[in-house]
Amino acid sequence: RFSKLGVKVIENYGRFIAPNILAAGKYHIAAKRFVIATGSRAFVPDIPGLEDTPYLTNDTIFDLRHQPEHLIIIGGGPIGMEMAQAQCRLGTTVTLIEGAQALGREDLEISSIVLDSLRADGVTIMEDTGVEKIVASGTSNKPAVEIHTSAGKISGTHLLVATGRTANIERLNLSAAGVDVLRPPVGQPYISTDKRLRTTNRKIFAIGDVAGGPQFTHSAGYQAGIVIRNILFKLPAKIDD
């Protein structure tokens, strides 16, 4: 699609080799402005037994060819809730485990309505419940998983890990471009930007999941509009607080 519109598409990983030069395969691209919009991937926590257990993420759950009998979801954020409601309404038994408060970053009045709705649908939501260990006990033909939690053992057929997203920044060699990465004590690393979505290298912008903030498609679209106004129209557009 983009090639037909006249856009040169390079299918390779890009990495900065200088503040104004990006290397991608055999290409070295020098530009006055860059926009980093590399998105994110599912964050997988370090839980004993998880690496030896088949699990799903919101990227892979849509590859299922058969409906899960009992889906256990680790993570009570927006992604976990979305998948829980969808699977439950399709007829799957769903148990959701959250280590703190489910939808804890959302408005309390609104999140309460959402949680009540999911519970009315039949979703079991366990809050303030830590996951201690995961054991895979089934076969490829008959999957089974056992979750050891602070509230006891939970058994199911499938496991979905929905503990957030982490920005795709590792391969970019951002230090060569003078772009700072923020590493908060809680949460995943992301690129530091100002209100105009400029990084610490003012010639490089970052939008979407890599820039922190709400990780939603509509948020990235809004940020793209801010960057376009800054780069193409020379307008000092800023994101709203």
Regions found by a protein language model. Give the residues of each.
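FAD-site-proximal beta/loop scaffold in flavoenzymes
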Residues: 51-67, 154, 158-235
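Glycine/serine-rich phosphate-binding loop and adjoining beta1-alpha1 elements at the start
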Residues: 2, 7-8, 15-19, 23-54, ...
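Glycine/Thr-rich phosphate-binding loops of Rossmann-like dinucleotide-binding domains
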Residues: 31, 44-46, 81-83, 104-105, ...
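A conserved short coil-to-beta-strand element within the FAD-binding core of flavoproteins
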Residues: 10-21, 43, 127-142
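Short hydrophobic core segments
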Residues: 14, 29-39, 73-74, 94, ...
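Rossmann-like dinucleotide-binding cores of NAD(P)H-dependent redox enzymes
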Residues: 62-63, 68-72, 78-141, 146, ...
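General small-molecule cofactor/ligand-binding pocket signal
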Residues: 8-10, 56, 124-126
